[in-house]
Each structure stands twice: as C-alpha cells, then as structure tokens.
C-alpha cells in the first residue's frame, strides 16, 4: 500500500534539481502525494535539508557553486537521518560532471544513486555511452547496477527499458513504462524525485518500496499513453501528470510487473 502510505505521510522532498525540470518535478511530486520544496542558496540549504524527509541532488545544470551547496545540504541531511538521492545527470559526458558526482559521493553519505545505464557506468568505471544527458549500455543492467552498488557503496537505481533497484546483493526489477517518456523533457529527473519520495517512507523493505515506486511511475505512463496515443507527446505529458494523481495501489496491483531476486 505504498501509494496510500505516501499520500498519508505527504513527505517534504527537498529538490536541488536543474532549471530545465523544476516545474515538472514539483508538479509530479504533488500529483503522487509528496510535498516539494526547491531551495538552493548556501544560506538556507542546510536548514531546509534538516527538516525535509528526503533530499534530491540533481546535477543537470551544475556549477561549482551548486555542487558546493549540494554537499552542504547532503551533510545536513546525513546528520538528520534523511535519505539522499543523487541523480548524476550527464555523468560521463564531461570531466566536470563526472568528477562533481564523485566528489559528492566522497563527501556525502548518498543513500541511492539513480541514473541511466551510461551515467551509472561512468561513475563505476564500467563500459557505457553518454550523449549529452542520455546514456546507454551494452551489458546486463542488473549486473551493471549490482557492480555499481558495491563500487559506490550505496543503493543504485538504473532506469531504462527495465528499471533495476539493488543494494549490491538483492535486486528488484520493474518492467512497466513507455517509450514516450523519453519524448518529454524531465521524466527521467522526475523519476529521481519519485525515488526520493518513496525512499522517505519508513519500511522494513527498502528495495521493494523503491521498486514499487518505479513500477507505479511506469503504470502511470502506460495509462497516459493509452489515453493520448492518437494525440501526441504534449497531451501525453499532461495525461501523465493526471495519471500520477489518479494512481492507486489497486492500479499497481493489477498492472504492475516486477520481480525480485
């Protein structure tokens, strides 16, 4: 009953995300039942991170100053016991992006790293391809994710055709979603925020609750596509937010496809 649990708890998610996706991320979190706050200034990030239920660090439009501020917020979240999710957007595309992510991982106790296959491969010194903020791999995403979790010393989420959640030992794979998600800017970044929201829930099964959140996200995308396939990507974007808001645990039970190993 994770969606119902999320909506009842209405967790505050501190999003230090990129300027391209801020509005979409906030609306997506509101739709699913979380409460977003976007705070970036050095003077307040620690205070905000202390009261938030989870912290998202998304480096999409990074600068040296923004990385410094993310580290301040991350350390504050660590002290408060709140989960920290790193979304290493474009890691592997430039040295600055890759090294900035590695610095965050060194200085902050990151709970989950969520990225596409190319980004995760770049951070864990595995083979992959990154083009701008898009990435791909030739290897098995499960093995990639498990290796990365052990190298990075954090849980890892690799999103793509199959969504993989692992702590390096146990694994949950989700099989929901739709290719049209790749035609709307910000859906990958929103999935990182969704991961942060579900990570904030107090549960005995951390991997399963994160996997559940990603499957729910994919179910919403599938339902949005069925509603708008004769219209196009713009209509899909709106329908997707609507479906996130309407989504129930019964929907996930009926349409969700995932397995654990």
Swiss-Prot record:
It catalyses: 5-(2-hydroxyethyl)-4-methylthiazole + ATP = 4-methyl-5-(2-phosphooxyethyl)-thiazole + ADP + H(+). This is Hydroxyethylthiazole kinase. Keywords: ATP-binding, Kinase, Magnesium, Metal-binding, Nucleotide-binding, Thiamine biosynthesis, Transferase. The keyword Metal-binding applies. It is an enzyme of class 2 (transferase). It comes from Halalkalibacterium halodurans (strain ATCC BAA-125 / DSM 18197 / FERM 7344 / JCM 9153 / C-125). Pathway: Cofactor biosynthesis; thiamine diphosphate biosynthesis; 4-methyl-5-(2-phosphoethyl)-thiazole from 5-(2-hydroxyethyl)-4-methylthiazole: step 1/1. The gene is thiM. Substrate binds at residues 38, 186. One of its GO terms (biological process) is thiamine biosynthetic process. CDD domains: THZ_kinase. ATP binds at residues 114, 159. Catalyzes the phosphorylation of the hydroxyl group of 4-methyl-5-beta-hydroxyethylthiazole (THZ). The lineage of its organism: Bacteria, Bacillati, Bacillota, Bacilli, Bacillales. Gene3D superfamilies: 3.40.1190.20. It comes from the Bacteria. Its EC number is 2.7.1.50. Its cofactor is Mg(2+). One of its GO terms (molecular function) is ATP binding. Belongs to the Thz kinase family.
